[in-house]
Amino acid sequence: MSKELLALFRKTGALLDGHFVLRSGLHSREYFQCAILLQHTDIAERVCKMLTEKLRAFVCDSVISPALGGIIVGQEVGRSLGKRHIFTEKEDGKLALRRGFKIDHGAMLICHPLFR
């Protein structure tokens, strides 16, 4: 992580210190609460542009992200790349395309890292 990005997480209060049990079951002394950073639209745009610069090397047709946490990042990355952004929502406990979103066979996607 760049010093600039880390400074933005600290500036917005999005880098939390304490004891955290992660979804993986591992423990951490620090936690990045991205929602705290993303509430600052100017900073969110800046951070997503940093991410976009790393993604420009990849060919894609669309950007896809999970609701709810990934929508802002997906939208900003899609905007910066000039690509369509779609998102998934939980349906019966699994992520699914809803709201009429479709992915063409063979389409190249950039996926938000929350997908597992």
Q: Predicted segment positions?
A:
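PRPP-associated nucleotide enzymes
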Residues: 1-116
